Amino acid sequence: MAELLRSLQDSQLVARFQRRCGLFPAPDEGPRENGADPTERAARVPGVEHLPAANGKGGEAPANGLRRAAAPEAYVQKYVVKNYFYYYLFQFSAALGQEVFYITFLPFTHWNIDPYLSRRLIIIWVLVMYIGQVAKDVLKWPRPSSPPVVKLEKRLIAEYGMPSTHAMAATAIAFTLLISTMDRYQYPFVLGLVMAVVFSTLVCLSRLYTGMHTVLDVLGGVLITALLIVLTYPAWTFIDCLDSASPLFPVCVIVVPFFLCYNYPVSDYYSPTRADTTTILAAGAGVTIGFWINHFFQLVSKPAESLPVIQNIPPLTTYMLVLGLTKFAVGIVLILLVRQLVQNLSLQVLYSWFKVVTRNKEARRRLEIEVPYKFVTYTSVGICATTFVPMLHRFLGLP
């Protein structure tokens, strides 16, 4: 078993998969500098966050929440694509596990398809992502080495590898959607199962193709997610009743996630993991509070039927498509405005409170600034998406 795990964690296995898909490292350009090994003359990669030199006067202390250590430097390796079908397929698949997908798919589901489904998806997604992000910084398993692996995503190089949160999120979204809709809508179950498997498989394979994870990282992420879905499934009906909880419920929804973010595992160097985790937990808290506000203040014009209720999937017409895109565009514009406004205000307040120079971008990485401003910003975004955007839709006459 130990030998099998070591083989699944081998970077050469990832490199062989990349070569099979037509992704190769570019030939060396000219002689090495002073005979140095490529790893010895590694360059700083754009997007790799490094520990700021100081936090405070005199530069004597590391940034709060960080140990003094240099971030890992990655060998900047050019690559050659010999099969553009796989290149574009896996680049698109990788995007299905990134922020751009979640900020489009989840709001679109809430505004145009079914708010109950979106709530289930978001809560399971938040749970899975938090556990995955924390596991990375607790286990501290490295990503595949480069060379031999070609790495296509530079922003995440500073993060650890095990488990793959892209694989976890894709598996959670796909199969939570399948399990929730099979008791609510009439459609061929086999078709839904195939779509869920294809979606999650493409995202998982994209993590190998982009060189960001080993096979063990991906399999570990899928297995952890499967276990979490099994363990949490009995509580899914309870999730549907959260909007009718007591008036103290929003306090718990704010305090618990903020506490988890503020006490996130200390990293050896700065990486975007803590900021991303804060964003995810804050968005989940905002969405949950938004549902509670809608129920408590009776802001929903007509209550939707709770799960499970068997319904026919309505046919897709031009009118429905235009209406859905219009509602989505209106909602995204409002969300972006709220995000920018709250972010600027929260940063100004925190900078003033901690007496930090406004132009000091490094200050955003400090624990006492990064966590509060991220949390306030994305909690506001979650509340806006579930409460104010639907109100704006009704005001504009968008059913």
Swiss-Prot record:
Induction description: Strongly induced by TNF, also induced by bacterial lipopolycaccharides (LPS) in neutrophils, endothelial cells, and other cell types. Not induced by growth-related factors.
Site (Stabilizes the active site histidine for nucleophilic attack): D217
Protein name as annotated: Sphingosine-1-phosphate phosphatase 2
Catalyses which reaction(s): sphinganine 1-phosphate + H2O = sphinganine + phosphate; sphing-4-enine 1-phosphate + H2O = sphing-4-enine + phosphate; (4R)-hydroxysphinganine 1-phosphate + H2O = (4R)-hydroxysphinganine + phosphate
SMART domains assigned: acidPPc
A single MF term (Gene Ontology): sphingosine-1-phosphate phosphatase activity
Keyword terms, alphabetized: Endoplasmic reticulum, Hydrolase, Lipid metabolism, Membrane, Transmembrane, Transmembrane helix
Spans annotated as Phosphatase sequence motif I: 136-144
Annotated Gene Ontology cellular component terms: endoplasmic reticulum; endoplasmic reticulum membrane
GO biological process, one term: sphingosine metabolic process
Transmembrane segments: 88-108, 121-141, 160-180, 185-205, 219-239, 247-267, 280-300, 318-338, 371-391
Enzyme class: hydrolase
The protein's role, per its UniProt record: Has specific phosphohydrolase activity towards sphingoid base 1-phosphates. Has high phosphohydrolase activity against dihydrosphingosine-1-phosphate and sphingosine-1-phosphate (S1P) in vitro. Sphingosine-1-phosphate phosphatase activity is needed for efficient recycling of sphingosine into the sphingolipid synthesis pathway. May play a role in attenuating intracellular sphingosine 1-phosphate (S1P) signaling. May play a role in pro-inflammatory signaling. Plays a role in the regulation of pancreatic islet beta-cell endoplasmic reticulum stress and proliferation.
Active site positions, chain numbering: H166 (proton donor), H213 (nucleophile)
InterPro entries: P_Acid_Pase_2/haloperoxi_sf, P_Acid_Pase_2/haloperoxidase
Region described as Phosphatase sequence motif III: spans on this chain: 206-217
Subcellular location, record wording: Endoplasmic reticulum membrane
Membrane topology per record: Multi-pass membrane protein
Tissue occurrence: Expressed strongly in kidney and heart, followed by brain, colon, small intestine and lung. Not detected in skeletal muscle, thymus, spleen, liver, placenta, and peripheral blood leukocytes.
Assigned protein family: Belongs to the type 2 lipid phosphate phosphatase family.
UniProt gene name: SGPP2
Phosphatase sequence motif II, as annotated region: 163-166
E.C. number: 3.1.3.-
Claim: Membrane is one of the keywords in the record: yes
